[in-house]
Each structure stands twice: as C-alpha cells, then as structure tokens.
C-alpha cells in the first residue's frame, strides 16, 4: 500500500528514467528543422565529422542527440519513415546497457538503427543479433540503404559462410547475424592455429533483438563444438527394449502405493526416479540379457555407464513425447522449441538423451559426441563491452536480466494508446468442453468477419484443433514446427477478414500481423508492378482493413496457459499493434498440464463449490490469480535452474578465459622460444624430484629409474651413475644443473640441424595441439565431475564448493601435464624439414573438417545437482580450497621458487 502511495507521489523508477531521457528527445526534435535544410552530401558528411570528434576525445553521449537527429533525417530521405519520439527513447535505452521493452508493431527494427549507428562510429563494430537467419538477412537488407547512405558498411553473419566471407562480415561497421553463429565463431576463433584463421574482432557492442528469447529461453543451451566419440548405438537399442517392461507408480504421494510401481514421475520437476522394486527389476532384466554380471549392482562404480544409459532410456520414454517435445522427420529426431514451437534441426539433447529418443523411435542412432569447446549464451554475451536488448515482453523477467546480466529493463510507452481488450480466462472442467467453446468462439468471430489467431502450446494440440475445424468445415491455416517454411506468407495474411490461423507459440515469428492482410507482400509477388496495380492493391487493402477494424480487429485465442507469463504476453501482443483494435482470451481446462500440476486442488475446489455443470465455464479474478501464481512458481524454478547452471559454468568460464587468453597470446607471438625454455627447467626438475628427492641422502636416490625415464620420455641417454661414481664433488644441485644443461644442448643440436625458423614453427604447433587435446580431456573430466557432484551432499558437503575445489585441482593437473607433454614431444619428434611441420598442419586441418557444431540442451537435473535437487540455492560464492589460498604473487606450491602467477597460475 505504502509502495503504491510513494509511486503516486514520486513516480515509478521507469517514469523517472523516461523523464530524464525526454530532455534528449527534446534536443533531437529541436535539431530537426536545421537537419532538414542540409543537402544529402552535408548529411552524409556528418559521419566523418562525428568520427573526428570521437578521435579527439569526445564521448558518445556528447554526440548522441546530433547522431540520432542525423539517422532520423536520413531515414526520412531513404525510407520515407520518421522515427517517432518513443523510438528515440528506445534508442537511448539501448545505448545505455539496458533492455527496452517495446510492444509488437512499435518499430523495433527501425529503433535499432539509432544505437547501431552511434556505436558504429567508434570503428569497433556493432553486432545486431536475431534469433534466425531469415530475420538477420531481412533486417540487414532492409536497413542497408540507410546505413550505406550514411557511409557505414553492413555485414551478414549466417551459417555456411567461408572464412573470408565471415571476416568481411565482422569487419563491417554493423554486422547482423544469429546468436548461435556469433557464439560458434567465438569458439572456432579460440581453436584457430594462426591469427589469420580468426574472424571476430574484440567484442564491443551487442544489440539483441528478442532478448528474452536469447538470454532467458536459450540460457540453458550451451553451444558445443564436438568430435565423434565411440559408437554405442547397440547398447542404446538393447536398453530401449527394457523400458516397456516397467510399470509407472501412479500415486507417488500415497503410502499404500509405495513400492507398487517401478518408477515415479515428478511432473513439477520434470524428473523420473526408479523405485526400489524398479531397480531390482532392471538389474534382473540386465542379468537375463547378459549385460550385467550375476550378483552385480547397477549402482556399482564399474556400471556407471550402464546406469547412465538406463536413466536416459527411462527419461526418453516417460518425459519426452512425440509431436510435443520433438518430431520425427526424414528418419531423424528433431527437437521442438518449447517456447516458440519451431523445430531446431541440428540441435541435440545432451547426456545421451537424444540417442535414447532415437532408439525409442526406431530411427538411426547417431554417435555421441566428445566436447572440444563449449560456452553458454550467458557467458558469451557477458564478454561484450556493451550489451543491450529489445523485446515486446521483458518486464516479467526484469529481475533475472538485472541479477544475471546487470541489465535494467525500461518499458518504453507505445506511440498510440493500446486499445486491445484482454478478457478474463475461461476455465472448464474437461479439455473436450474447452475445445467445443473454442470452436464456438471461432465461428462467432467468422460471422463478424473478425480474424482469429489461435495459439497452442504443442504441435499435437494444433493438429487436434485443425481436425476439429475440418469437421466443422471452418477454413483455416496451420502454422507450426512442421510447416514453418510457409511461415511469413501465412502470418502476413492472418489479419484478413475472417481468417483463422492456428499457431504453435508465436514468439519470435518476426512478421507483424497487419489488419486486412499485408499489401506489401502482394506487391512484391508481382513482377514489375505498375503504379495503377500498386494503387489498386492499396485501395483494396484499405477496404479490408476498415472492415476488420469494424469487426473488432484481430482476436487472440489461447488454448492453454504457458508455463511462462511472458510467452502468454507475446501471444497477446500480436493483437493491438500501433493502436489497432483487438482482443484476447485464454480458454483453460482442469486437464491442462499447468492446471493439473500446479493449480488443480485450489481451483477444483472452487469449481465444485460453485456446482458447475458440463459445458459451463468459471470466470473469476480468484482463478486468474491462482493460475498466475502457478506460473510464478514455474518461472521461479526455471530461474533457479538457469542461475545454478551459471554458477557451475562460471567455474568452467574462469578456466576457459585463462586458457583462451593464453592460447591467443601463444598464437600471436612470433616465437615461443622463451616459453619453452621456462617450462623445460620445471619439467626436467619435476622428473628429477621423483627419483632424487630434494635434500635427501644418496642412498634414497633411484638413479637407474631416472636414467630410464629420461631416455623414454626425453630421448636423453645419460650415464648418471657413471658420473656419480667418477666425480665425488657431484651433489644433488650440480647433478640437476648438468641434466638440464644436457637437455638444452641436445635441443640446440636439433635446432642447428633443422634451422631455427622451422623449429620455432614446430614448437608453436606442438604447444597449441597439446593444449587443445588436454583441454578436450579436461572438459570431459569437468562434465563427469558435474554429473556426480550432487552425491557429495550425502556426505554433508556442499556440492558447489566441492565442484569448485575439485575443478581447480583438475585445472592444476591440466597445466602441469601440458608442460610435461610439450617438452616430451619436442624431445622425441625428429623434425627433418619444413615439410614435416606442413604435414602436421595438414593432418590437423583434416581432423578439423570432421568436427561438428552441436547445440546441446542441458537437462535440468544435470544442472541443479542431482535427482533430488537437494543442493540448496545459493548466491555465487568465492572459491574455497583446502589449505590457504594461493595469492597471485605468493611462491607457487609446486616448489619451483617462482611466483604463482608466473608458474602454475599461468600456462608459462
């Protein structure tokens, strides 16, 4: 109550932000008359003038008003479109590391030209990021004339471009592309073997369209570059045959049913667990098929891989449904995006789940892959110096944007008042009653000539409605993951008189629904249309538009509430664009998944008290509130999953940044001769320490073992025992120096034989290849560590802290092994000439050609730390290690005598 009172007096934070920005809008408007008088050449010359001022030390903020006025005037001349004041406000929000919530149809694409132009003036590059290739190409081509008029270059970064084409795209002032492609290019650049192979410049400014889709819906999807691992398809097929023998435990909360079933499903958490009886049954089935030894347990350490396959198969059969979570097309299992309803070809579930679904559907099982490089979108986008985004629905996720990315959300007002009528939800007892009511509503709308957009949450539901409409002889179009090739065409005409369009989650479709249909597309369909044809098309459209407005505008009809309020708001936002008439209503039933899982008891109780009859609906604010609370619960859980993913990935991210920074340093260096000299002393000394412990008596020395090891690993055949027998004054330190000097002399001899330039090139190639191989193994070790870390909770240990501690130890091991392996390879390999180095490089390129890009959707329980989710939610905490923390300037614990930052704290 007091909060509302204070807001009335002082205004909301959003109002205060907009009020501050309005002063700059007034400045831009004041400049408009002067800029209208400029010739085209004078207007174009503004770009060079701004760049000179920036070079002289001016800030972007100081030239913002003039730059925005320049873009507005150029847009009037090139597009005959003038930026509204609210678009100027949106542009300023986007320049200030914030997220602009702008309603559908408010011209987000045109708004983006303002901050894109301003930030491109620095010459550091601007990345405008969209959700798919079609939108990236469309927006780039639409805005290219404006930017080129102002003397800026535009690039498009999409899948399938060659290296030079990608370089050209990134070297442009403004680069349009998809989030996936920018992320993969970052990973590929950090796997390059020469600076010439890199395509990206340092990451400066990212402007993300549909920012909620990319930074929230995609946050659990790591980008992975992978190579094929061993084939285990036979095992998936065998395990798949076990699952139909298992029985679900129906009433997991009832004591009388405990132990009756083989597995239980937790629908809220989207998890499945074996019961004690189920575990025994699976073990017996595995023993019968000869896959498990008699008396052996599925949960023993030796059978972890088998347990992994059984769990994946159970999840595939019980939690993943065909035509809801995936479709089968041309013998392939293709994931369906739960948020947009789009198919995602090329994307695969991780943890062996995709192979288990392939086995379930009887299609070809593709090999599991080994991770070579990976990053989450959360950590990729935090690499940018400046980050901003725009969407029609950000306010419900404002806390997450601020908490994870440090981005405030500003709701930008609409240019015209919104007049869409959002009606209360109607709740029915059964799904059948709900569908009958939906059909009746559609018929009523068609009689009035009002277009209807029906939003469904799954392909299965959209096909069910389509069958009902065929039965009722209602003409309609279906837009879902199976038919999105016709997407733009269907959406463009969804606003025609009496049109009925069924769409699986409309989020991110990228094409506005224009009342009366899209006249631009009609003109584009004609070859060389005459002025008369254009005028006729526009006049016909105006007539249709007026008829649709009179009928009430576009009617949005939701068939089920989504888990996220934001997705529901996106569906509603398709109507009422730019002040158009429109309406929306959601039809629900007690059989809907959200209602069944989260809101059933309370709402069912209300309905029974009201004595509802068949076909009767309940419409009450209490019900709407109960549903909204259910959605909040799901949103909170999903936020916790994303937050925990980030906390785990932050550990890997710190290591990734160290490795990538060091790798780039090595690659950019003309020679790494000094690095090799530094690590050779460490490596040889560490080997000597194993056989001649420091400050030990000679009786404890294992000289034969040392001689053998030096010969096997470093090709050093040294008569150490002979030296000791002949030279009484030879002690531990002088012996150590002689062995290290012997290695240096042997290496110098190799250098004289092949030539310094060839050896320098070979050193770099060995260092990079060894680092890449060990990094790949390290990522696999980190994966295995993460998958089992939740079990530490049973030992009263904090799984997150244990993960941080053990991953640090793994990283220490990586650095130590890297040094040893590099010196060992350089010692053993005989390089004869430049051709040997070139052959090594050719083999590497051949291997590179085999790697593939995967988008792997991380499973929830893999992220939150185990089946029971017992690991408590916590804020990101500092890394805890056993013993004292090693400071960067402290002596390295390895005993080298050097500072930690110059030894194990760095690769060299």
From Swiss-Prot:
Lineage: Bacteria, Pseudomonadati, Pseudomonadota, Gammaproteobacteria, Alteromonadales
Composition-biased stretches (Basic residues): 898-908
Classification via NCBIfam families: PRK12904.1, secA
Membrane topology of the entry: Peripheral membrane protein
UniProt key word RNA-binding: no
E.C. no: 7.4.2.8
Keywords: ATP-binding, Cell inner membrane, Cell membrane, Cytoplasm, Membrane, Metal-binding, Nucleotide-binding, Protein transport, Translocase, Translocation, Transport, Zinc
Enzyme class, UniProt record, top EC level: translocase
Family, per entry: Belongs to the SecA family.
UniProt cofactor(s): Zn(2+)
Identification of the protein by name: Protein translocase subunit SecA
Positions contributing to ATP binding: 87, 105-109, 512
Superkingdom of source: Bacteria
């Amino acid at each position: 109550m007091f909060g509302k009172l204070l807001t009335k007096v002082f205004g909301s934070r959003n109002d205060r932000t907009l009020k501050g920005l309005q002063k700059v809008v007034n400045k831009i408007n004041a400049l408009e008359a002067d800029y209208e008088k400029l010739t085209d050449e004078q207007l174009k010359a503004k770009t060079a003038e701004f760049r000179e001022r920036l070079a002289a030390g001016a800030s972007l903020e100081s030239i913002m008003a003039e730059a925005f006025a320049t873009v507005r005037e150029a847009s009037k001349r090139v597009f005959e479109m003038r930026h509204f004041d609210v678009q100027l406000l949106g542009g300023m929000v986007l320049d200030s590391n914030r997220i602009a919530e702008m309603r559908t149809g408010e011209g987000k694409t045109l708004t983006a030209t303002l901050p894109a132009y301003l930030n491109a003036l620095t010459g550091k590059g601007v990345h405008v990021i969209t959700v798919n290739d079609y939108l990236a190409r469309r927006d780039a081509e639409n805005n290219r004339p404006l930017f080129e008029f102002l003397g800026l270059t535009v690039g498009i970064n999409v899948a399938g471009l060659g290296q030079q084409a990608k370089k050209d795209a990134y070297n442009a002032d403004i680069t349009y592309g998809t989030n996936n492609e920018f992320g993969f290019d970052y990973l590929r650049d950090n796997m390059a073997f020469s600076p010439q192979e890199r395509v990206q410049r340092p990451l400066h400014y990212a402007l993300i369209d549909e920012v909620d889709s990319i930074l929230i819906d995609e946050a659990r999807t790591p980008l992975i570059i992978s190579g094929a691992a061993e084939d285990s398809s036979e095992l998936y097929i065998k395990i798949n045959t076990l699952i139909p023998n298992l029985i679900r435990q129906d009433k997991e909360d009832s004591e009388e049913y405990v132990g009756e079933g083989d597995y239980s499903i937790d629908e809220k958490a989207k998890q499945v667990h074996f019961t004690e009886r189920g575990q025994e049954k699976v073990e017996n089935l595995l023993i019968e098929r000869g896959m498990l030894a008699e008396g052996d347990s599925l949960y023993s350490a030796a059978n972890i891989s088998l347990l992994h396959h059984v769990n994946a198969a159970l999840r595939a059969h019980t939690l993943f449904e065909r035509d809801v979570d995936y479709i089968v097309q041309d013998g392939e299992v293709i994931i369906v995006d739960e948020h947009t309803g789009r198919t995602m070809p090329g994307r695969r579930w991780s943890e062996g789940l995709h192979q288990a679904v392939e086995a379930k559907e009887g299609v070809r099982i593709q090999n599991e892959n080994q991770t070579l490089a990976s990053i989450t979108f959360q950590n990729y986008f935090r690499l940018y110096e400046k980050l901003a985004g725009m969407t029609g629905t950000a306010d419900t996720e404002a806390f997450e944007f601020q908490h994870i990315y440090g981005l405030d959300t500003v709701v930008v007002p609409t240019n015209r008042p919104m007049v869409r009528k959002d009606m209360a939800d109607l709740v029915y007892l059964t799904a059948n009653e709900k569908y009958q009511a939906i059909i009746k509503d559609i018929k009523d709308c068609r009689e009035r000539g009002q277009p209807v957009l029906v939003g469904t949450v799954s392909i299965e539901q959209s096909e069910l409605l389509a069958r009902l409409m065929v039965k009722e002889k209602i003409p309609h179009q279906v837009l879902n993951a199976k038919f999105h090739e016709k997407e733009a065409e269907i959406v463009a005409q969804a606003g025609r008189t009496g049109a009925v369009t069924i769409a699986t989650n409309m989020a991110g479709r990228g094409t506005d629904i224009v009342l009366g249909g899209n006249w631009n597309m009609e003109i584009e369909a004609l070859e060389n249309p005459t002025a008369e044809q254009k005028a006729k098309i526009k006049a016909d459209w105006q007539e249709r538009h007026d008829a649709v407005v009179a009928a009430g505008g576009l009617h949005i009809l939701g068939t089920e509430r989504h888990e996220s309020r934001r997705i529901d708001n996106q569906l509603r936002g398709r109507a009422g664009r730019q002040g158009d008439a429109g309406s929306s209503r959601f039809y629900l039933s007690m059989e809907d998944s959200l209602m069944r899982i989260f809101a059933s008891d309370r709402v069912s109780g209300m309905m029974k008290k009201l004595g509802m009859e068949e076909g009767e609906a309940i419409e009450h604010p209490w019900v709407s509130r109960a549903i909204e609370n259910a959605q909040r619960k799901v949103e909170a859980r999903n936020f916790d999953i994303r937050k925990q993913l980030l906390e785990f990935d932050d550990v890997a991210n710190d290591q990734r940044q160290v490795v990538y920074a060091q790798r780039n340093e090595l690659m950019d260096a003309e020679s790494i001769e000094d690095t090799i000299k530094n690590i050779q002393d460490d490596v040889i000394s560490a080997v000597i320490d194993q056989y001649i412990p420091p400050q030990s008596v000679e009786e404890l020395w294992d000289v034969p073992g040392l001689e053998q090891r030096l010969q096997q690993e470093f090709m050093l055949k040294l008569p150490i025992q002979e030296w000791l027998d002949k030279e009484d004054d030879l002690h531990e330190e002088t012996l150590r120096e002689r062995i290290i000097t012997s290695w240096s002399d042997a290496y110098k001899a190799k250098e004289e034989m092949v030539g310094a330039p060839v050896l320098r090139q070979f050193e770099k190639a060995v260092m990079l290849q060894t680092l890449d191989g060990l990094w790949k193994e390290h990522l696999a070790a980190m994966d295995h560590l993460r998958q089992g870390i939740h079990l530490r909770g049973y030992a009263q240990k904090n799984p997150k802290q244990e993960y941080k501690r053990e991953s640090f130890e793994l990283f220490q091991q990586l650095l130590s092994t890297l040094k040893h392996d590099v010196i060992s390879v350089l010692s053993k390999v005989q390089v004869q000439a430049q051709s040997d180095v070139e052959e090594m490089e050719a083999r590497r390129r051949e291997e590179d050609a085999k790697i593939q890009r995967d988008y792997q959707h991380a499973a929830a329980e893999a992220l939150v730390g185990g089946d029971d989710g017992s690991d408590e939610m916590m804020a990101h905490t500092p890394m805890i290690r056993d013993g004292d923390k090693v400071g960067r300037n402290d002596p390295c614990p390895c005993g080298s005598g050097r500072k930690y930052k110059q030894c194990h704290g760095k690769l060299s």
